[in-house]
A protein has these predicted regions:
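Cell-envelope and extracellular/periplasmic
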Residues: 16-17, 53-58, 80-84, 88
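Serine-esterase "nucleophile elbow" of acetyl-processing enzymes
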Residues: 1-56, 66-75
Length: 202
């Protein structure tokens, strides 16, 4: 066994926001993925190992199916769980999403792994956002994200868990939309957003 494999292990588990996907732009023309887990590893240095398991487009039901092989069988000390944005994109009920998240939280706890729930970030729509229909659509989507996030925060509070509020960290405080400083497509983070995520997690 090498020295590196003896270090405490943290698994970052989720979808494209865990994979570090971002839409190509001036700062990232070649679609380079910049996972927050890499930033977390930079801060941890030799005090721990970070493994990243993010699958683009994945919904929480799919995350549940691979949780054992990807997380439980690896026996990490901690798992950071971010999921639900794709479910919301398919208009899934926040309560249904939360049931899937709780399955993963509880499976981790039963295996003596510390789960770190993460709230889902907001979204942003620029073109036509001032149109009444678009404004109502956007408000509805943000409201559903906030509903899911309240469920996540309430669960963490009841179980005495620390959770990370990615929504608040990356949202414009006035509009509650995903801030332009951290996203260039209104859905995914940019390198700046992922770096903020990793730094604040640390």
């Amino acid at each position: 066994m090498t020295a590196s494999t003896q270090l405490p292990l943290i698994v970052c588990f989720g979808d494209s926001l865990t994979a570090g996907y971002q839409t190509p732009g001036p700062a990232n023309a070649h679609e380079q993925e910049t996972p927050y887990g890499h930033v977390l590893q930079e801060y941890l240095g030799q005090r721990g190992r970070v493994e990243i398991s993010g699958i683009c487009g994945e919904v929480t039901g799919e995350m549940v199916l691979r949780f054992r092989g990807t997380v439980l069988d690896r026996k990490p000390q901690m798992v950071i769980i971010l999921g639900g944005t794709n479910d919301l994109g398919w208009n899934a009920d926040p309560a249904e999403i939360m049931r899937n998240l709780v399955k993963m939280y509880e499976s981790a706890r039963a295996a003596s792994i510390v789960p770190v729930p993460v709230t889902v970030p907001s979204i942003r729509v620029d073109a036509g956002a001032d149109h009444p229909d678009a404004a109502a659509w956007l408000a509805g989507h943000i409201q559903r994200r906030q509903q899911l996030n309240r469920l996540i925060a309430d669960y963490a509070g009841r179980k005495g868990l620390s959770y990370f509020d990615l929504f608040t960290a990356t949202a414009d405080p006035d509009s509650l939309m995903l801030a332009e400083a951290y996203s260039n497509d209104g859905l995914h983070l940019t390198t700046s957003g992922y770096r903020l995520f990793g730094r604040l997690l640390y």
